[in-house]
Amino acid sequence: MHTWKMWAICTALAAHLPEEQALRQACLSCDATQSCNCSFMGLDFIPPGLTGKITVLNLAHNRIKVIRTHDLQKAVNLRTLLLQSNQISSIDEDSFGSQGKLELLDLSNNSLAHLSPVWFGPLFSLQHLRIQGNSYSDLGESSPFSSLRNLSSLHLGNPQFSIIRQGNFEGIVFLNTLRIDGDNLSQYEPGSLKSIRKINHMIISIRRIDVFSAVIRDLLHSAIWLDVRKLAFSVPEKIQLLRIMSSSFAKKISLKQCLFTDATVPEIVSILEGMPKLMEVEMKDCTLLGTGKWYKQIHANQSQSLRILTIENLSIEEFYLFTDLQSVLDLLSLFRKVTVENTKVFLVPCKLSQHLLSLEYLDLSANLLGDQSLEHSACQGAWPSLQTLNLSQNSLSDLKMTGKSLFHLRNLNLLDISENNFGEIPDMCEWPENLKYLNLSSTQIPKLTTCIPSTLEVLDVSANNLQDFGLQLPFLKELYLTKNHLKTLPEATDIPNLVAMSISRNKLNSFSKEEFESFKQMELLDASANNFICSCEFLSFIHHEAGIAQVLVGWPESYICDSPLTVRGAQVGSVQLSLMECHRSLLVSLICTLVFLFILILVVVGYKYHAVWYMRMTWAWLQAKRKPKRAPTKDICYDAFVSYSENDSNWVENIMVQQLEQACPPFRLCLHKRDFVPGKWIVDNIIDSIEKSHKTLFVLSEHFVQSEWCKYELDFSHFRLFDENNDVAILILLEPIQSQAIPKRFCKLRKIMNTKTYLEWPPDEEQQQMFWENLKAALKS
């Protein structure tokens, strides 16, 4: 029994391993989180080997045509399945039978000609379904979504989609987003969407007003945000079909890629004005055929809730003929937030501005406003409640005039005038007294002056040509200096309350501990994307400053060393310089000290062990060796060179010289007093005299061993002993001395005294005759 169990286990493992291997061969991009990216691989089928481990499977942008029953059978833990942009035309009925945990299914942009409720039956956990871009013309006779109780977002439709039937959405009670691409939708059965009680965001792309009217009738109380696309509001008579919208509970209406005319605008405004809960209207990428001559006066409904108007990229071909909008002045008084962006606005009529009594936010960015037109638009009494004004990407060029035009806006605290062309700015300007935020980025300002108001709490001067920052702004909390040419941090004393600063993409090389800590309130500093010089001081500060990682934005990946070359490209936080690079002066001082101590020790040791003597002797010996070899015997001039102390000269000159030079035969003696060549270096005289003498007589006494020149003569005689290997020295003890009195370095002479007989001058006259006989015999040997 045990054997059969083992065989079964081994067989299962053997089957499982080839499956996983097959998956890896077909799809090589499975990561540690069990997410497999098999997109753009030219697959014709779902790869085999899918296991229960996989949670995300991306098969988008392949050539898959069919999904079969067994393809996904083992992928029981799939949460996300992406099959968009394939060629899928057929799905077996139970293909998704094992995907009870699936939350997102994308079948968009395939070739499905029909939808089957059986496909989605097992997907009771599904939250997001995308089936747009296929070729089905309807959703079937019943609801394909009836079992999808947890569905949150649904995207359907395609160019062939033409009919929505009653019951197609049965089973769906709530949707966060429903998007229907119905450009060619021609038939809508009333009540089809009525089963959905609430849709937070309803997006419908549709071209027929009558069909749209039928759809809206079913969404009156369920759609919170109604997003309409590609609808042409061009025929006034057809606009009447939309009167039903006045009963809608929608809070926001978006009109995108729609068409309007002067004749239909008043009708549409009238409908929107009647919607009891409408708070926001948004128009994007629309076209207006007209010049604003709306002959029908629009009166404000004091009970209306509309507060926000957004117009972006509105195309008005004859914008230069546009009127002053007299017909809608009454409607504007309740608006709190208005955005008119990229719509070629070159002037806001003064009267219109004065009617915007409740306006708190105004965005006129990416338009054609100039200095003069702004002065007219912001006339006295205009925008009395305005707090935020965005005039970026216009044609402003005079900063002083801009400030003066807005000076009367007492409530204005945020002003964005970025991406204008101010250039040089004056020293003095007038500004609204409560201005707290000013955006002057990308305005080609080369230098900041006191024109900048001192009341600011936030200042953005990014992307200019600034070399430094020297303004005193005592209330400033946020400063943005990105993309300038600053080389150092600003002075903290000028901006003592700064909390956040961005100085990225400048010419900042480093900053010190003192500079960093001088900003007492600093919580965020973005100094990324600078060319840092990773000096020892900078690195030491970075590595040891507590909490700097929490302050620096983008740390550590955005802080890169530019120099030295050895660490270029490395992250500042990971660089460690050597001791030599960081403490060069200290190291040089230490080396010099050690060298000095070494020399001092050498001097002391040399003095103690007579190193100087050895050096002098070596030099003298080398000098002597460089001379021609010793003169032959016929060049010997003296029988002996006499080395003696000046204190013993009386005995040498009056006694020894008399005895030896007057002997028969006489001896020739060399005395330094008598025979040294005048003007010649003493050392050379000593060497020459010793070399020209057959013997060297040393008259030893206490005075002798204390004489410097006698020591020289002993030295050279000592070298001669070693060089010629003969006994040329004759020692005469004029008075008894201890052998220890002779310097220890003369080991050869000490050995002679210890091993050979030396002559000692006897005080007894009877013995002196014997002394002279022995001396003469030694000289002749």
UniProtKB/Swiss-Prot annotation:
It holds the Pfam family TIR. Residues 1-24 form the signal peptide. The keyword Chloroplast does not apply. One of its GO terms (biological process) is inflammatory response. Keywords: Disulfide bond, Glycoprotein, Immunity, Inflammatory response, Innate immunity, Leucine-rich repeat, Membrane, NAD, Receptor, Repeat, Signal, Transmembrane, Transmembrane helix. Highly expressed in ovary. Also detected in brain, heart, lung, liver, spleen and kidney, and at low levels in gizzard, muscle, testis and proventriculus. Participates in the innate immune response to microbial agents. Acts via MYD88 and TRAF6, leading to NF-kappa-B activation, cytokine secretion and the inflammatory response. Mediates the response to mycoplasmal macrophage-activating lipopeptide-2kD (MALP-2). Belongs to the Toll-like receptor family. Residues 636-779 form the TIR domain. GO terms for cellular component: plasma membrane; receptor complex. Residues 607-781 are cytoplasmic. Binds MYD88 (via TIR domain). The gene is TLR2-2. One of its GO terms (molecular function) is triacyl lipopeptide binding. It comes from Gallus gallus. It is a single-pass type I membrane protein. N-glycosylated. This is Toll-like receptor 2 type-2. Residues 530-584 form the LRRCT domain. It is found in: Membrane. The chain crosses the membrane at residues 586-606. Residues 25-585 are extracellular.
